[in-house]
Amino acid sequence: MVRTINETFLKACRGERTDYVPAWYMRQAGRSQPEYRKIKEKYSLFEITHNPELCAYVTKLPVDQYNVDAAILYKDIMSPLPAIGVDVEIKSGIGPVIDNPIRSLQDVEKLGEINPEDDVPYILDTIRLLTTEMLDVPLIGFSGAPFTLASYMIEGGPSRNYHNTKAFMYAEPKAWFALMDKLADMVITYLKAQINAGAKAVQIFDSWVGTVNVADYRVFIKPAMERIFAEVRKMGVPMIMHGVGAAHLVNEWHDLPLDVVGLDWRLPIEEARARGVHKAVQGNMDPSFLLAPWSVIEEHVKGILDQGMKQPGYIFNLGHGVFPEVNPDTLKRLTTFIHEYSKGQLAK
């Protein structure tokens, strides 16, 4: 069954004019929601993501509660890695921990390939369930970017400085580029499968790429990103790029064959556009503001919207994920304000 969906988010991704600014929030599904916390008392992240009905419920929850204009699939960026031979465990309070970190070209050569229908059928089944029976807004599929995935695979888990990752990149370029190629292949196959299952847009998260300078990005990372976006672009859905602490890289992203440049709060929207970012833009509220009084939030959001609405192709989002401490009522109120304020301004 083909469902009719609200396409405001997709229109903004394509740089088209919209009646109001669409909004969704990174990590909108999860830790700040009482319903989610009750589910987590019974089920682990692994159990939720491997149960299509439960995962679909968690994914749809913020759409119903906050009236956001897009859903993003509830899963972890590490989800596809076990399929290629990476032993990943998500440890509470730590994050992803990998027992077999990459240390050599031989380690890279041992990595396999992903077959999504066989390796992650539960993810594709969740997408099909959401897009055929549950959602009235577009579903965003996603993947981690090769650099961020590689950083976990080399460090063995989260890192504050990524010294091992960058040392490997500099000292073992042959192994590094082999790893980038392997991960690019995986990301391409993984995203295409999500789109074929029903995702209407995809976002690539490069959470830790801000640790790399522009020159190194161009040499060691950008070629893989160019290949990913060029291949996935053939699927005909909008593609979004997002990283954290990476304001120095936005022009590099703008050069990629993508549709939307995601910004965090460190770079004002008007400054990004002044630097030459003329594609659609997504962002860029500091999630810390969500813990402030409403009067403070409202004035801050007005400023972001006034910058974003100066040209078509703007999607409101946070610069990073929702904190567990955020009151869900604040997010609901925020979405209503974004819609109403932007509708009034755009109608002038």
UniProtKB/Swiss-Prot annotation:
<comment type="similarity">
    <text>Belongs to the uroporphyrinogen decarboxylase family.</text>
</comment>
<keyword id="KW-0456">Lyase</keyword>
<feature type="binding site">
    <location>
        <position position="46"/>
    </location>
    <ligand>
        <name>substrate</name>
    </ligand>
</feature>
<dbReference type="InterPro" id="IPR006361">
    <property type="entry name" value="Uroporphyrinogen_deCO2ase_HemE"/>
</dbReference>
<protein>
    <recommendedName>
        <fullName>Uroporphyrinogen decarboxylase</fullName>
        <ecNumber>4.1.1.37</ecNumber>
    </recommendedName>
</protein>
<keyword id="KW-0627">Porphyrin biosynthesis</keyword>
<comment type="function">
    <text>Catalyzes the decarboxylation of four acetate groups of uroporphyrinogen-III to yield coproporphyrinogen-III.</text>
</comment>
<dbReference type="GO" id="GO:0004853">
    <property type="term" value="F:uroporphyrinogen decarboxylase activity"/>
</dbReference>
<dbReference type="InterPro" id="IPR038071">
    <property type="entry name" value="UROD/MetE-like_sf"/>
</dbReference>
<keyword id="KW-0963">Cytoplasm</keyword>
<feature type="binding site">
    <location>
        <begin position="27"/>
        <end position="31"/>
    </location>
    <ligand>
        <name>substrate</name>
    </ligand>
</feature>
<dbReference type="GO" id="GO:0006782">
    <property type="term" value="P:protoporphyrinogen IX biosynthetic process"/>
</dbReference>
<feature type="site" description="Transition state stabilizer">
    <location>
        <position position="76"/>
    </location>
</feature>
<feature type="binding site">
    <location>
        <position position="152"/>
    </location>
    <ligand>
        <name>substrate</name>
    </ligand>
</feature>
<feature type="binding site">
    <location>
        <position position="207"/>
    </location>
    <ligand>
        <name>substrate</name>
    </ligand>
</feature>
<keyword id="KW-0210">Decarboxylase</keyword>
<comment type="pathway">
    <text>Porphyrin-containing compound metabolism; protoporphyrin-IX biosynthesis; coproporphyrinogen-III from 5-aminolevulinate: step 4/4.</text>
</comment>
<dbReference type="GO" id="GO:0005829">
    <property type="term" value="C:cytosol"/>
</dbReference>
<dbReference type="GO" id="GO:0006783">
    <property type="term" value="P:heme biosynthetic process"/>
</dbReference>
<dbReference type="InterPro" id="IPR000257">
    <property type="entry name" value="Uroporphyrinogen_deCOase"/>
</dbReference>
<comment type="subunit">
    <text>Homodimer.</text>
</comment>
<dbReference type="Pfam" id="PF01208">
    <property type="entry name" value="URO-D"/>
</dbReference>
<feature type="binding site">
    <location>
        <position position="320"/>
    </location>
    <ligand>
        <name>substrate</name>
    </ligand>
</feature>
<feature type="binding site">
    <location>
        <position position="76"/>
    </location>
    <ligand>
        <name>substrate</name>
    </ligand>
</feature>
